Amino acid sequence: MQALLFISCGAILGASLRWAIGLLFNPLFSSFAFGTLIANLFGCLIIGVLLGLFWQFPQISSEWRLFLITGFLGSLTTFSSFSSEVVELFFNDKWLNGFCVLMMHLFGCLAMTVLGIWIYKICSQLLS
């Protein structure tokens, strides 16, 4: 039951941030939901940093992992919104837009995760 509390608290914060990002960034482009891309890229950057942290300090409690990764990042990032937005572009015969959004999410998120790990490693070395 305690694990559910940690996940839920993280999810409240992650979902709130995702909603705010959508409000701020979605109006910028009419061709696709820019807020979803920003939320996913930011979430992947943060998970990269957290992966580096958890790899270096495996003794960090599972509660923090549940709060940050499962709760916060799980609700901040959104595969279902990304999927529905790409499918909608395809169904509206906006094939190029759909493919571009698909590639931005896929490769952008992978790159941001790697960047997050590198950022953690560099900061860790500078601070030690």
UniProtKB/Swiss-Prot annotation:
Fluoride-specific ion channel. Important for reducing fluoride concentration in the cell, thus reducing its toxicity. This is Fluoride-specific ion channel FluC. It catalyses: fluoride(in) = fluoride(out). It is found in: Cell inner membrane. Belongs to the fluoride channel Fluc/FEX (TC 1.A.43) family. Na(+) is not transported, but it plays an essential structural role and its presence is essential for fluoride channel function. It comes from the Bacteria. Na(+) binds at residues 74, 77. InterPro entries: FluC (IPR003691). HAMAP family: FluC. Keywords: Cell inner membrane, Cell membrane, Ion channel, Ion transport, Membrane, Metal-binding, Sodium, Transmembrane, Transmembrane helix, Transport. One of its GO terms (cellular component) is plasma membrane. It holds the Pfam family CRCB.
